[in-house]
């Protein structure tokens, strides 16, 4: 082993890095950017949990609300007397937890059924409500212990988890993983595509042909969008076969969003590649995009637990809206219109990056 040769090769490689200023800048700035972002954003606090209360009497509803207001991170969105209203609020997405107080058997109402207080929970993301459920149960048990007559300590408490009855975390992550997989693949493919062609000389051949920028972008998009759609469907089917992930009818609407989602992220990578001078800097730009997207979209942590500024930034990323569409379609079984509604910001983002890609294509 010749140390002189190794030293000479090392010097050559170092000079190449120094000459590639974009790559060198990204090598230094990306780690700093990531540690700042992760350091400030990965401080998940306790989410504000929306609670709806339904009781047979207004006084009963007020008593429950008064007890709930003593708990932290709780917002009462509704307190009505109609039975089933709290259950409906959770099913329609207006509340995260619903409390259904039954009629209490007494001398005034001896025919009231002996039913427990129902705690209806949106269990799409079990981590979001775990602490609040424990506090409600603790407060209720303390109140029962404080009764002087244990024979009249009131009904029991029953927890009913909707959409994810067993509170399975794999059901929470599996639909969202379809978006993460497609995002990473498309951004990476888009980021290295143009840089690789430019370095290999094939980009000049493309530009010499009598094709417009629109035709060129459309031709590049078509196969990648197909690949991204197949990837997303494959994740859902695998989750269904291995983990029993439900695939209700609204999943079809969710699949319709996959081509737009894939196209958006391929064009993001393409625009990065147009600005980059080498494949290395293009890949670094891709990593700098998809890591914050994963962090701030609610994939790693419940979105509601992120700091307020992180939620604002997170709503810019298409992945955030795609994950909400995934949960609404696969777990909550919302109607197709509601699921497709999450595609509006994704399509808006697609329109912006498409214009940027056309501009970058003409500038090359």
Residue ranges, per PLM feature:
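Long, hydrophobic alpha-helical segments
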Residues: 42, 173-191
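Transmembrane helix boundary and interhelical loop/hinge segments in multi-pass membrane proteins
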Residues: 17, 93, 188-209, 221
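Membrane-interfacial helix-loop-helix junctions in multi-pass membrane proteins
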Residues: 163-167, 246, 297-353, 364
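Membrane-interface capping segments at transmembrane-helix boundaries
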Residues: 358-364
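Alpha-helical membrane-protein architecture signal
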Residues: 3, 7-11, 163, 171, ...
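Extracytoplasmic/periplasmic domains immediately adjacent to an N-terminal transmembrane anchor
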Residues: 1-171, 338
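Transmembrane helix segments
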Residues: 29, 36-48, 276-316, 320
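Alpha-helical transmembrane segments and their short interhelical loops
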Residues: 213-286, 291, 337-343, 347, ...
